[in-house]
Design a protein with these regions (language model features):
Chain B
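Helix-to-loop junction immediately C-terminal to a conserved catalytic motif
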Residues: 57
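The feature captures the beta-strand-to-loop junction immediately N-terminal to the Walker
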Residues: 42-44
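Conserved ABC transporter NBD signature motif
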Residues: 65-72, 85, 138, 151
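Catalytic Walker B motif of ABC-type/P-loop ATPase nucleotide-binding domains
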Residues: 178-181
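Conserved catalytic motifs of ABC-family nucleotide-binding domains
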Residues: 174
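A short, surface-exposed alpha-helical micro-motif characterized by mixed small hydrophobic
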Residues: 219-221
Length: 290, 260, 340
């Protein structure tokens, strides 16, 4: 039982990292709350499904194209919507949330509901970790979860674009004075964040079925992880994902699965009340309250 | 120049420190302000003057030390509680309500619990009267009553009027102690020379004042005691003449001697 | 400047009649009185006549009432967002709390609607204010996020602990005695909320609340507690929202977790932004547009939400002033292009 919790809690945490990292990245770099995050997550899943099943492309190509598509959607959302309301936080939230609704409810209207749509798993095999059986999709999830964090970290450290992103995150004005295009960088950030959401969808969806409701759930999970970890703090996001991942798995193991969401919602509310800058963030308190 | 020297301390600051991480913005500063005093606080930029004020008025919590008002410990109390006790401040970066007319800016402090309790303005606290009282106060501060100035949006007023509006907010609260954070800065010489008599008048009405200033010449016309800060520490304190001749103060202000 | 292109700028000038009717002299001529009163009279007349016109079609009567319900929720949102500076994404919280409170009062304690609605409004507003009290120091996006979570948490708690009727909710709640009671009760309440709040924001107490939005540091320096001021404002907003919820459940005789549904948080925002933020009347106008629209789209299921969301996004991004501010400008000012 102990190893069960250890392993599956770890998997749950890795899934949360995947779900939240894109949201955290976008907010961290350009201070843009992308509330369409969950919608992009679901939408990418459906694109992959449609390319694979309706168009009949090979699965690897469908995956690749759908991830590119999610990046494209991110760029579009930035240039059509976010750029015009940038700086007005509340408008950003409302506009991105509304666009997310358009995607999700549009899919629902188009008839995607219920448990009929599934994505194939990468492999059917099962491995044993500490004698706990884990299917290969979940192994992949763990590996990719951390690979992505490592990749983004390397990106920000060693590429020009990555350094521009990092510079923007620290001080937008100073970065602009050094010749970094604020719009382009923010668009890249939103695109990267959306692609991360897409990758997460393509790894996590095969474990269950494609449903529109996942979009709302993922958004709340992403917000929970980012708020508890400190909005915009990447290290905080990872730590918070573990705290929340394990506590979620514990509620499933010992209580009712119903409480999974309650845990997340309470975590958001409690964190914002007690320490709005998050438990692992390094942002100044003064920014969000006096 | 103030002539009240009853030596009744109303504000006592004892070894106050405020550290931001490793930076000692204010370090072990003590100061006693007596009733009727006009105390000037001088020092180069970054010497901790505004931080000190923020600690006194509750906008920041001091790391160490105490502040007491009328012998009552007020360290770390909430800003509105301290304002309610009669310590009122102006902001260096003026903070009017830009979307309201100038006189409505004063209706806010006139609606505060302190204004209702202490009252004393002609007309008192009833609704409708506050507008009149607000215009009265503005007139006292040099807003011409019959001009349109008191009724203009605060956002459209020039700096000189905004500074007066900051003072007006303090006056509306019937303060015992006004702390001015650089009221003279950013003003022209003629604007300053019209503000100086106003400060003297308020002091004459029995209001104790602490003034942070860079404009030493004007400050020394009104202040009866001066404290000099440098890097968060108190350099010296005393009569204006003593302070200005203190070698460390001269050193800190070297290069700006034309001010004296 | 030596460029050949002539530049133009749009100049706006107050109409003569607007300036004349600003002061007491407006009473000089009927034309000016009419100019001043027409918009108000039109609004009031529309709502007073609505039940009389719609009485042969009870279904559309209910739609008319839905306009009022949404208008109340939107007024509550507009007041909080644009007069206090607290953008709440959780309007459904007020609505649901009011609804459940009235349901319990009516079914468990047997209070008739005449009592259960006002009591639920007051108790509900008290509950909401207490629940939001710890969040009041939060600003901007942080307050928005936390309020978005409150109604979601309520549904999950009701589901998980199976309290307050669980997923089923309450049924068999008393309805109103007659069509016109139901209609005019709500319309009257909407007018009270609308004109009451409009008056309040211009009184000294309302001014203090607006000052908090403008500059809370100055309010603190004026010896006024910002948290207490915000709490008062939240209480007023939750009164409005809770009343809407309490009234609605008596209209339909049941309440369920759908009272905390997301639509109820999104629709008021859409109505406010479309109608014109910061006007309090705008939200009523927005509601009067959105509710009938949603009736026509009823057969299209979730396409309804897609249409709302698109319209909402369009307004947020391209026409953020909303209809009311646009119309006011056209009514009061002439525009022309001037060469510069």
């Amino acid at each position: 039982m102990f190893y069960d919790i250890l392993v599956y809690g770890f998997i749950q945490s890795a899934a949360l990292i995947l779900m939240a990292f894109g949201f955290s990245l976008v907010y961290g770099v350009s201070r843009l709350p992308n509330f369409a995050h969950g919608a992009i997550y679901v939408f990418t899943g459906f694109i992959a499904w449609a390319l694979f099943n309706t168009v009949g492309l090979p699965y690897w190509l469908s995956v690749l194209l759908s991830i590119l598509a999610s990046g494209g959607i991110g760029v579009l959302i930035y240039y059509v919507i976010l750029r015009r309301v940038r700086g007005m936080e509340v408008s950003e939230v409302i506009a991105t949330y509304a666009i997310g609704l358009v995607f999700l409810e549009g899919l629902r209207y188009a008839g995607f509901r219920g448990g009929t749509y599934t994505l194939p798993v990468a492999s059917d095999g099962v491995s044993f970790i500490f004698d706990v059986p884990v299917d290969h999709q979940r192994v992949l999830l763990m590996i990719l979860g951390f690979a992505m964090v490592a990749l983004i970290w390397l990106l920000t450290k060693y590429t020009r674009m990555g350094r521009a992103l990092k510079g923007m995150a620290q001080d937008e004005r100073a970065a602009m004075m050094l010749g970094i295009d604020s719009d382009a960088t923010a668009a890249v950030a939103v695109a990267l964040g959306s692609m991360l959401a897409g990758v997460a969808a393509l790894i996590i969806f095969p474990l269950g079925s494609l449903v529109v409701e996942e979009g709302y759930k993922v958004l709340i999970y992403a917000i929970a992880v980012c708020v508890v970890g400190g909005l915009g703090s990447w290290a905080g996001t990872v730590i918070a994902a573990f705290v929340l991942g394990y506590s979620q798995y514990m509620t499933v193991a010992y209580g009712k699965p119903h409480f999974q969401m309650v845990v997340m919602l309470l975590a958001i509310i409690a964190t914002l009340i007690v320490r709005p800058s998050g438990f692992f963030g390094k942002q100044k308190q003064l920014e969000e309250r006096v | 120049m103030s002539t009240h020297h009853t030596k009744e301390p109303i504000l006592e600051i004892r070894s106050l420190s405020k550290h931001f991480g490793g930076v000692k913005a204010v370090d072990d500063v003590s100061l006693t302000v007596n009733r009727g005093d006009v105390v000037g606080i001088i020092g180069p930029n970054g010497s901790g003057k505004t931080t000190l004020i923020n600690c006194i008025t509750g906008f920041l919590k001091p790391t160490k030390g105490t502040v007491s008002f009328h012998g009552k410990d007020i360290t770390g109390k909430k800003p509105h509680k301290i304002a309610d006790m009669g310590i009122n401040r102006t902001f260096q970066i003026m903070r009017p309500y830009f979307s309201m007319p100038a006189y409505k800016n004063l209706v806010i402090p006139l609606s505060s619990p302190r204004a209702k309790r202490v009252g004393g303005w002609r007309g008192g606290g009833k609704h409708g009267d506050r507008d009149t009282v607000a215009v009265d106060i503005l007139e006292e501060l040099g807003f011409e009553r019959d001009s349109r100035v008191p009724y203009k949006m605060a956002g459209t007023l020039p700096t000189g009027y905004l500074k007066r509006l900051e003072l007006g907010r303090c006056l509306a609260l019937r303060p015992e102690l006004i702390i001015c954070d650089e009221v003279f800065s950013g003003l022209s010489a003629s604007e300053i020379s019209s503000l100086v008599p106003l400060i003297e008048k308020l002091n004459g009405q029995g209001i104790t004042m602490i003034m942070i200033e860079h404009r030493l010449a004007e400050l020394f016309r009104v202040a009866n005691r001066v404290m000099a800060l440098s890097y968060g520490e108190k350099v010296t304190e005393g009569e204006p003449d003593e302070v200005i001749n203190h070698p460390k103060v001269r050193e800190a202000y070297l290069g700006s001697e034309e001010d004296f | 400047m030596t460029t050949e292109t002539t530049q133009k700028r749009r100049e706006r000038i107050d109409r003569g009649i607007k300036v004349r009717s600003e002061s007491l002299y407006a009473l000089n001529s009927f034309e000016e009185i009419a100019y001043l009163l027409t918009p108000r009279v039109l609004l009031i007349a529309a709502f007073v006549l609505m039940p009389l016109i719609l009485s042969p079609w009870p279904y559309w009567g209910r739609v008319g009432l839905s306009v009022c319900i949404l208008a109340l929720l939107s007024i509550s949102f507009d007041f909080l967002a644009n007069y206090v500076g607290l953008v709440s994404l959780g309007g459904a919280f007020f609505y649901g709390v009011g609804g459940y409170m009235a349901a319990v009062l009516n079914t468990e304690l047997g209070l008739p609607p005449v009592l259960s609605i006002p009591v639920a409004t007051l108790l509900g507003a008290g509950f909401c204010t207490l629940a939001l009290l710890p969040c009041l120091p939060l600003r901007g996006i942080y307050f928005a996020i936390v309020t978005l979570m409150y109604p979601l948490l309520m549904t999950r708690i009701i589901e998980a602990f199976d309290i307050l009727g669980g997923t089923e909710g309450f049924r068999g709640i008393d309805g109103f005695s007659g069509f016109f009671t139901e209609q005019y009760g709500l319309i009257l309440a909407m007018f009270i909320a609308l004109f009451g709040l409009r008056r309040f924001v211009n009184m000294d107490g309302g001014l203090v609340i607006r000052a908090v939005k403008d500059n809370d540091q100055s309010v603190r320096a004026s010896g006024i507690s910002v948290t207490r001021t915000k709490a008062k404002a939240v209480f007023l907003a939750s009164l409005t929202g809770c009343f809407a919820g309490a009234y609605y459940i008596h209209m339909y005789s049941n309440v369920g977790i759908s009272s905390f549904a997301l639509d109820l948080s999104i629709m008021p925002i859409a109505a406010t932004i479309i109608g014109g933020a910061g006007t309090l009347v705008g939200p009523v106008l927005g509601a009067a547009i959105l509710v009938p629209l949603s009736e026509f789209l009823r057969d299209f299921g979730s396409l309804r939400i897609v249409v709302y969301a698109l319209v909402l996004t369009g307004f947020v991004v391209f026409r953020s002033e909303g209809l009311m501010n646009y119309m006011t400008r056209k009514y009061q000012q002439v525009e022309r292009w001037v060469k510069i």
